[in-house]
UniProtKB/Swiss-Prot annotation:
GO terms for cellular component: extracellular region; nematocyst. It comes from Anemonia viridis (Snakelocks anemone). It holds the Pfam family Defensin_4. This is Kappa-actitoxin-Avd4a. Residues 20-31 form a propeptide.
Length: 76
């Protein structure tokens, strides 16, 4: 009985540790996987997305220019 209780306690502690670790990861925003780029006629710096036909959603991009085969996306 003591071994079974100890095993349950170990499993419970491990579950708490892994759950807390996942919550820590969820707090951080995902990194953009883009390089800096510039388009002629547009002020500021854009994000160069390699081998994409369109700008990805969820980053607030409002304009873009093509640098074949890549795309340079501009926020706001």
């Amino acid at each position: 009985m003591n071994k079974a209780l100890f095993l349950c306690l170990v499993v419970l502690c491990a579950a708490v540790v892994f759950a807390a670790e996942d919550l820590q990861k969820a707090k951080h925003a995902p990194f953009k996987r883009a390089a800096p780029c510039f388009c002629s006629g547009k002020p500021g710096r854009g994000d160069l997305w390699i081998l994409r036909g369109t700008c990805p959603g969820g980053y607030g991009y409002t304009s873009n220019c093509y640098k074949w085969p890549n795309i340079c996306c501009y926020p706001h």
